[in-house]
Amino acid sequence: MTSVEKASKACELCRRKKIRCNRELPSCQNCIVYQEECHYSKRLKRSYSATKKKNGNPVLESAIPSLSPSPSIENGSAMLNSDITSLSNRIFKVEEKLDLILSLLKNSSEPLDRTERKDFPSLAMQIRDANSLVNTKLKEYSRRFELPSQKTSFDDLFSSTFPNFDAAFKDIPDKEWAFENVQWYFRYINCWWPVFYEKDFMDEYECLYRDRNQVKGAWLVSFYSVLALAASRSKAGKDQKLAESFFSTSWYLIQKPGFFLTPQLEKIQALLIMIQFAAHVSLHTLCKALCGQACLMIRDLNLHRESANADFSNKDAELRRRVFWICYIFEITTSLVFGTPSVLSDMDIDCEHPNYEYGRYFSEMPTGDLIFSSEVSLTILKNEVRTKVYSRTNTSNARNREKAIWQIHEKLLCWERALPIELRQYFIALTENAQIYEELDFEKQRLFSACIEVYLSYCNTLIFLHRLNESVEGANICLDTARRAINVLKFFFIIPIAKNVCYLWVFLYCPFTPFLVLFSNIVNGKEPSTDIAFEDLNRMYSVNRFFVKLRDIGGDLAEKLASVTENFIHAAENYFAVQPAFMADAFDFASFLT
């Protein structure tokens, strides 16, 4: 058999640093992190069998004398090899033709109700769909008013910039100041996203101020990222610059050689904290890159396999599980927003769910595990929506897709019924618009605020699920769910709970999803009731107010989405203005925002 040469799939940087390459185009994850151009050379690597044949066995070659074949034998052997190669090529081509014929026969035997495959509705795709709706449905009225039909690209929404190394904060901050900010992190962040055991982290903190050389570099990355998160909660300009400086220090530390070379649990923890801050300052492309690196380390450490925890104590095994599930939530939700393939969704996951008994080791707020466990279960269902409803196999047949939709719908209802009693009573209050926030104490207000975010995430999941449901019932579920979600924003979230908003809001429950449902319903003229149409427009204003409110909290992305929603509201107003049923009504954008 002839030797086979295989093309090397890794880029030049990954081959040079001897690290795993995920082979993404136009740039792999490692090149994004190291800020280098990604090049895939045409270099070939010879297979083991070919190398062995070329090099031979020196011991045997020296022991056996070489024989010089006659010219006639050489010519005959060459002709025989040529005939064998030609026959092999012809057989291979015949097999290809047979496979093609069989695939055509299989396709012709399938039902004729094949439907076009649709990708999962990423944020950029949702905005493009709304733009397309403006261009098609309102085109006949273009002479009467100017339409905001400018396109919003992926690069417009998600900045691809990276931190500036010149702003790195290289000195250890004051101990008392750092202590207050670390305590804030464990009370307000780590309780919902349990990345660290509080006691273990504080032990390293004390060690840092005794002797910096005794602290691991990965923990130092986490320390500066925690300070960046804590400092960013202040609206003062100097604190914002200080937060960016802390994060730049973390970014500088992970650029050191060897950080991505060997996978460690401490490094994954550091990357998770950096992801949270990057989302806060709208560096969402950096979120995706850091998430990819964390997933590679998870795969190398087998955190997704419960059998890998057998050699660890119960406490350490629980920490490994929680780190995996946090990364799972981040990676699945970011891939849905970006519309990119997920790494962890294709893996065989058998990791156990978080154990409530260990919640007290992560934060003084024991109810934080209620939110975290609910997010884990809901994210699993989100991934199931994409893999079963938006996959190639199920979208090729409308009946299969509708069956999958209702099966997952039943699972979502079971998820809601199985919520802990503390969360279920808040879900009921949110559905009924019951004003209970002021009646709660401070800790319960925090839990209620977090429950609102879970509720909005649940609503978005229902909308994504029934977006492809062609039945009337599915369309009604989408519309009713969108109205309930925006009602929550309007009555509960904007004032006074916006100050407690999660830094990952765009990935977990971006309100543009229900906004698009109401906008499409209005512009398509599907709402026969004038009063309900006015109420839906008012709800759209509430989404715009949400983004305006989050400009100081959510960075540039919230400001861009505020501008986008304002343009679409303007288009909906103009559509109303040319309809006979609405000619007598006037709209004032400012009146809805006061």
UniProtKB/Swiss-Prot annotation:
Q: Where are the transmembrane segments?
A: 503-523
Heme recorded as keyword: no
Which Gene Ontology terms of cellular component type are present? chromatin; membrane; nucleus
- Record bears the keyword Metal-binding: yes
What GO molecular function annotations does the UniProt record carry, in alphabetical order? DNA-binding transcription factor activity, RNA polymerase II-specific; RNA polymerase II cis-regulatory region sequence-specific DNA binding; sequence-specific DNA binding; zinc ion binding
| Gene Ontology BP annotations | DNA-templated transcription; positive regulation of transcription by RNA polymerase II; regulation of transcription by RNA polymerase II
Membrane topology designation = Single-pass membrane protein
DNA-binding region as annotated in the record: 11-38
> What SMART domains does UniProt report for this protein, alphabetically?
Fungal_trans, GAL4
Q: Which Pfam families match?
A: Fungal_trans (PF04082), Zn_clus (PF00172)
InterPro entries from the xrefs?
AtrR-like (IPR050987), Transcription_factor_dom_fun (IPR007219), Zn2-C6_fun-type_DNA-bd_sf (IPR036864), Zn2Cys6_DnaBD (IPR001138)
- Keywords in UniProt for this one? DNA-binding, Membrane, Metal-binding, Nucleus, Transcription, Transcription regulation, Transmembrane, Transmembrane helix, Zinc
Q: Where in the cell is it found?
A: Nucleus; Membrane
Alphabetical list of PANTHER family matching this protein: TRANSCRIPTION FACTOR PDR1 (PTHR46910), ZN(II)2CYS6 TRANSCRIPTION FACTOR (EUROFUNG) (PTHR46910:SF37)
What's the protein called, per UniProt? Uncharacterized transcriptional regulatory protein PB24D3.01
Q: Which organism is it from?
A: Schizosaccharomyces pombe (strain 972 / ATCC 24843) (Fission yeast)
